[in-house]
Amino acid sequence: SRDGFVETIVFNTALMRRRIRDEHLIMEMTEAGQTSRTDIAICYMSDRVDKELLANVKSRIESLHIDDLKMNQQTLAEAMFKRKWFNPFPKFKFTERPDTAVACLLEGKVIILVDNSPSAMILPTSILDMIEEANDYYFPTVTGMYLKVSRAIITILTVFMTPVYLMNPSWIPSMFEFTAVRDVINVPLVLQFLILELCIDGLRLAALNTPSMLSTPLSVIAGLVLGEFAVQSGWFNSEVMLYMAFVAVANYTQPNFEMGYALKFMRLILLVLTAVLDWIGFLLGCLFILCFLIFNKTLSGRNYLNIKLN
């Protein structure tokens, strides 16, 4: 069997205490919800935690006025940090692994455990934390760095590959000329990309609602059959299908599901702006994404692009 958090908060605190048997590990119990009165544990290392962040977290939890925590830690997260409805980037990182939670504690972060939830909430969180995978630390240093760099490159390609291609389909290095569009399709490229984005989400939702024994065969068969007939019918270019297949697979390299959709929305904005204003729209889209990340703040008010702990 493998160690992991469960729905009982007492067991979860014990799993963390087994790994850190130090007097500086503090677990403060409180509760939220006027009706549910759900137990909450605020865990931190007293000699490493950012005191300002800790005070901020405590004050936010104490000032909560909600009836219950219907969705456990997700309800708590939304109540603690009410972000704008148009902001898709996650402000909290969740993990079901005690080793990951303990590693974050030793880095000076705050862990919040909610009763009836098998996940731990990690604060503060930056975009770099979202694309980081816990398994990277179980490999040698060179391998771990390679996986991190590869994931970062794939993340960038996921956002910019299709908009760059849409901006100038003929602008391809000689060694990659085999990827150039040769089929004459009446459907504009931008519509092809947007339709395929919707189709990929449709296949993903279908796989989620399909019995587990059939989900994988259904995804493979549906993707192959629909892709083949979509190209043969003249609706899509085969090259466009290739790029969108890469994007679809690259989305699964994101450890955080919510971050994958945030990157998807940024890619859609870039696609639309590039289609309307060409290279000017692409530059405006890049500037918009950059400003969005720069002015996006974490729970402690720090920059979302990076976090420096005490």
Which residues make up each language-model segment?
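Cytosolic regulatory modules rich in charged/polar residues
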Residues: 1-189, 301-310
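Conserved, well-folded catalytic cores of nucleic-acid-processing
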Residues: 19-23, 60-67, 104, 108, ...
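Transmembrane alpha-helical segments that form the functional core of multipass membrane systems
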Residues: 119, 125-270
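Hydrophobic alpha-helical transmembrane segments of membrane transport and translocation systems
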Residues: 238-310
